Amino acid sequence: MSVAGLIFSNIHNSAIPELTSVRTMASVPYGCRYRLVDFPLSNMVNSGITKIGIITHNNYQSLMDHIGTGKDWDLARRSGGIRILPPFIAAYSNANAAKLYSTRLEALMGVTNFISRCTEEYIVL
């Protein structure tokens, strides 16, 4: 069974604004060594998923610095691997192009290009 993975990097940003004002929730440190994104990434890689996209919203520079090429998860590959998916503002609506997505469905609509290029049979969110 072929599976790709998608991770939302900003799911609970509003829960702790003190920590997420300059970084996304996925890049919040845990245990002084890890970031919160490490856990879903490791779970996906250990389950055999080798193509993973991380949907971002804002303040994702520290996430990009932490992920790097994906070498720590054996995701530095030519095909598959890891992709940072920044918000694509006009992907789903021309009505309000200045507004970023506010729901998960709108975020998924913004990464339809990534989803449509996936040759995998399933996508895990």
Regions found by a protein language model. Give the residues of each.
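N-terminal glycine-rich phosphate-binding loop and ensuing alpha1 helix
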Residues: 1-82, 90-91, 105, 117
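Short loop/edge segments at beta-strand edges and connector loops
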Residues: 86
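A short, glycine-/small-residue-rich helix N-cap motif at loop->alpha-helix starts
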Residues: 92-108
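Short aromatic/hydrophobic "clamp" motif used to bind/position activated sugar donors
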Residues: 123-125
